[in-house]
Amino acid sequence: MTVAVEVPTTTSTTTSTTTSTTLPPTELTMSIGTSVQGRAIDVVHRVDIPGAQLAVDDPNRVVVLVVGVIHGDEQAGLEVIKELRAMLPSEIPANVDLWLLPTINPDGVAPYQRHNANQVDLNRNFPYKWGMIAEPGNWEYSGPSAASEPETQAVVDFVTYLRPDMTVWFHQEEFSIAPSTGSDGPLRRAYARLTGLPLKGVPGGTYTGVAATWQRKTFTDDTAFIVELGPTLAQGEALTHAHAILSIVPLLP
């Protein structure tokens, strides 16, 4: 890690119920960009945990990023984000610096639609082996060019800046996690075991412009993978996924 982001736009604090003393913030929220329609794309940094206090160049520091929503009609990942925000500091490994990105597609979340406001599938718009797919109105439209969308640009810049050691990208509704023959294979298998997700390949072949693929191929020392949740996610299941994310950190290659 060479850079840490510490420029919040808003601060969440907890205050005492008996005094006016302001306690240290549990998290900081900052905007990393705006959507087509001008909505903020916010990231949350858990600053109350020991890992957030480690020096940027500390070899023990592990930066973990969790992305709840890319496709606006796949919102179950938000429940996992909620559980990670609610965890006590003692539940989070001391070396983990935890960052949470609820959605990169606020314009899709608002009307519960897959695409952004330009009708672009953001998970076909990232700048790795991007290819033109379909046209506006098609569910898989990749946009007019690689990283054409402000949401994609914001995430590319932020990930390039933060350089997470591990990123989990949530999707729905395949209820699976893709296996890997690479160095992150044991990590994916452990996640599947902890959550009960079956290990199986993504249907439909190889896709272009995918966020997690862009991240893996651009930053080869980083681990990034997709978790496909089912159609629904109960609170207990969301908590299981939250704990699984933290439990696999020691398996990072």
Which residue ranges define each predicted feature?
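Active-site/substrate-binding loop(s) of hydrolase catalytic cores
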Residues: 58-65, 74-202, 229-230
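Short, conserved catalytic or adaptor-binding loops enriched in Gly and charged residues
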Residues: 20-23, 91, 215-219
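Extracellular mucin-like PTS domains
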Residues: 1-22
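Active-site-adjacent mobile loop/cap segments within catalytic or ligand-binding domains
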Residues: 177-179, 188, 206-253
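Conserved beta-strand scaffold positions in the cores of enzyme catalytic domains, especially
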Residues: 29, 43, 100, 167, ...
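Soluble metallo-hydrolase cores and metallopeptidase-like ectodomains found primarily
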Residues: 23-57
